[in-house]
């Protein structure tokens, strides 16, 4: 009997159906000599600090750095039952072999190995490596199972990454939270991402726009621009000179240019385009893609490759033929598919690019939600564009001389629409416009030496523009490329985060209060600014990730030592704790919430603030305080709210509805007066207005 362990229930169910394991049990399928179960993602994780020592439940500087010598693991909360199922299955006497069917790559390896180790399993295991949930792909994968132990170095790389993130995250988060009296989540990926947001927002807010002028010359249907002019008088002089002169085309340059078809989608590219066109967040795009994958309509979405392998060419061309028949906007397009640009075995590691499946050709869009339809259309259109001919055009640059000045006119003429035709048709069919698309400017026929009488000139006043705020589209791109120049070419991961985790990083920054969404823009908050300012560069720069990936790639290849890597991480963590042992009192107040005065003290004129139990005067020498549990309000069964306190401070009275009368047992409306006599306690009284 073989036990197959998938990463998710949906994947397990799909594999079970193909293998003929059709008998549903509690937490697994059985049949045809197979048991098929699943992990529910990260079933086992590194234990938290308190597992090692109960005193770590309280965050204290003296306990830092926390460096486990004997690492411990724990079952994820709420997933205990499924781990128990897997453990029992692993130890069944009739199970002779285990198949690791978790996602291919570093994290999938980690997920399986953690379960295998936690269950104390010693049985041999093999590795399933597939990129599609289609039946043919699953069958082929099982006919080519690999030796599980050949991935030991990959597992060590994954384990080192997990431990290093734990050490930096736990210690840096506790260190800076203790120093600044606020929970400050610090992470190797999250913090540099926040810093990029802060740097961009600061560049925008500190940008000083500068005015400049441009003279536009209109001659014989040609519109040509001058260079930038900082002086308005110079622009006026140019305009006057041109209107008295004849214009001449002094040079004409024509150049044929080609724009190659786009590559296929990896997850980051899909997220970027979905955000730009539809406003989908990165998390939404992954959720929609995952749902399509589980419906067998889309290949594995968490890929970082934009290529297919050579053995996929024939099946991919069949997909293209089917899409041309399925998609209405392709009916009049003659497409001769060429996949050579996106076929590269060396650039497909864990999984190939995101593609529609053959199952989608049968099912179509009929059962899909609107969001899934949009995403599926993007993937289909990208495949068709990638297989189409290049876009070819003629670029024309003309120099026009007039009044002693030179102007430039640029235009282009399409020679072959190629893949751009498909992109335009796809956009039109979905009624979406690409805001970044540039309009095509066509120049009239021109020749060198051609003259133009009575040219017209006009002055345009313009301003330099600040950088644009990050959107999820542009931030994902920045994360993908951060630190790339320092990362080895063959590293499994480049940039900040992975194709699968970047969305979670953005969401975490928002939920922690360090960033916020304003429309499509991502903006850092005040706390985000402060956090980026207080942390050392080693935590705010993508350099750390680049260095780690260099080492982790070496570990995965067997050329670097896991022990040496972990020793360097421990030394870095200890150095952080030692360097940041104390801060000034002013810095410690950076994350203190800004207090908002609710009114003015009737005794001394100082500001009155709301506390947990009272409303108090900010002048410590003044004894004015109104208690929220004042018996006056409790007897009348009314909460002493901030709004009531503010009204009393402003007007000395407030109208309150539904107060309870202890004499009549009924409610009444009345005006409450602030009857302060300057004593230890503030008094209140009612001018009743009974119903």
Q: What positions do the PLM features span?
A:
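Intrinsically disordered, low-complexity regulatory segments
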Residues: 1-162, 166, 465-466
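C-terminal or mid-to-C-terminal helical accessory/interaction module adjacent to the motor/catalytic core
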Residues: 137-217, 254-255
């Amino acid at each position: 009997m073989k036990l197959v362990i998938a990463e998710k229930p949906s994947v397990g169910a799909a594999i079970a159906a193909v293998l003929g394991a059709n008998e549903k049990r509690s937490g697994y399928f059985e049949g045809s000599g197979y048991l098929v179960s699943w992990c529910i993602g990260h079933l086992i994780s590194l234990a938290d600090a308190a597992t090692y020592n109960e005193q770590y439940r309280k965050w204290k500087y003296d306990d830092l750095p926390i460096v486990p010598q004997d690492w411990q693991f724990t079952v994820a909360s709420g997933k205990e039952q499924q781990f128990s199922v897997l453990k029992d299955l692993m130890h069944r006497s009739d199970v002779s072999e285990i198949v690791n069917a978790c996602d291919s790559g570093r994290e999938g390896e980690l997920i399986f190995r953690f379960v295998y180790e936690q269950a104390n399993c010693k049985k041999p295991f093999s590795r399933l490596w597939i990129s599609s949930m289609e039946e043919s792909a699953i069958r082929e994968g099982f006919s080519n199972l690999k030796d599980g132990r050949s991935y030991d170095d990959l597992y060590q790389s994954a384990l080192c990454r997990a431990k290093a993130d734990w050490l930096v995250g736990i210690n840096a988060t506790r260190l800076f939270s203790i120093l600044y009296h606020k929970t400050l989540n610090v992470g190797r990926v999250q913090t540099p991402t926040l810093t990029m947001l802060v740097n961009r927002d600061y560049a925008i807010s500190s940008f000083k726009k500068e005015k400049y002028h441009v003279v536009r010359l209109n001659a014989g249907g040609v519109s040509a621009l001058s260079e930038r002019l900082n002086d308005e008088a110079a622009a006026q002089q140019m305009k006057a000179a041109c209107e008295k002169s004849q214009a001449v085309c002094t040079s004409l340059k024509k150049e044929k240019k080609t724009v190659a078809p786009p590559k296929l989608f990896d997850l980051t590219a899909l997220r970027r385009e979905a955000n730009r066109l539809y406003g989908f967040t990165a998390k939404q795009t992954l959720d929609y893609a995952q749902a399509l994958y589980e419906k067998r309509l889309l290949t594995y979405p968490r890929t970082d490759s934009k290529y297919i392998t050579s053995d996929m060419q024939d099946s991919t061309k069949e997909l293209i033929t089917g899409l041309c028949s399925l998609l209405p906007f392709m009916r009049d397009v003659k497409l001769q598919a060429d996949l050579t640009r996106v076929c590269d075995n060396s650039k497909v590691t864990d999984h190939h690019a995101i593609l529609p499946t053959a199952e989608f050709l049968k099912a179509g869009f009929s059962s899909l939600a609107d969001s899934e339809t949009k995403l599926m259309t993007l993937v289909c259109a990208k495949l068709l564009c990638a297989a189409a001919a290049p876009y070819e055009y003629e670029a024309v640059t003309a120099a026009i001389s007039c009044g002693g000045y030179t102007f430039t006119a640029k235009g282009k003429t399409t020679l072959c629409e190629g893949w751009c035709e498909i992109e335009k048709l796809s956009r039109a069919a979905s009624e979406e416009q690409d805001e970044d698309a540039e309009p095509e400017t066509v120049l009239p026929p021109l020749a060198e030496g051609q003259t133009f009488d009575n040219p017209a000139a006009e002055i345009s006043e313009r301003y330099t523009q600040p950088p644009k705020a990050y959107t999820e589209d542009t931030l994902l791109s920045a994360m993908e490329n951060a630190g790339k120049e320092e990362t080895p070419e063959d590293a499994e991961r480049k940039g900040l985060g992975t194709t699968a985790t970047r969305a979670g990083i953005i969401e975490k920054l928002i939920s922690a209060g360090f960033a916020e969404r304003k429309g499509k823009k991502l903006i850092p908050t005040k706390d985000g600014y402060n956090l980026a300012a207080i942390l050392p560069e080693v935590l705010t720069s993508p350099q750390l990730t680049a260095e780690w990936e260099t080492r982790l790639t070496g570990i995965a290849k067997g050329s670097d030592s896991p022990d040496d890597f972990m020793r360097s991480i421990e030394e870095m963590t200890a150095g952080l704790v030692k360097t940041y042992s104390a801060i000034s009192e002013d810095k410690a107040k950076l994350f203190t919430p800004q207090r908002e005065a609710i009114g003015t003290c009737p005794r001394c004129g100082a500001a009155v603030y709301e506390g947990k139990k009272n409303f108090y005067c900010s002048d410590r020498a003044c004894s004015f305080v109104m208690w929220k549990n004042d018996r006056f309000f409790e007897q009348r069964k009314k909460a002493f709210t901030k709004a009531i306190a503010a009204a009393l401070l402003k007007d000395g009275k407030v109208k309150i509805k539904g107060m309870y009368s202890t004499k009549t047992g009924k409610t009444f409306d009345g005006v409450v007066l602030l009857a302060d006599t300057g004593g230890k306690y503030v008094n209140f009284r009612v001018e009743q207005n009974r119903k």
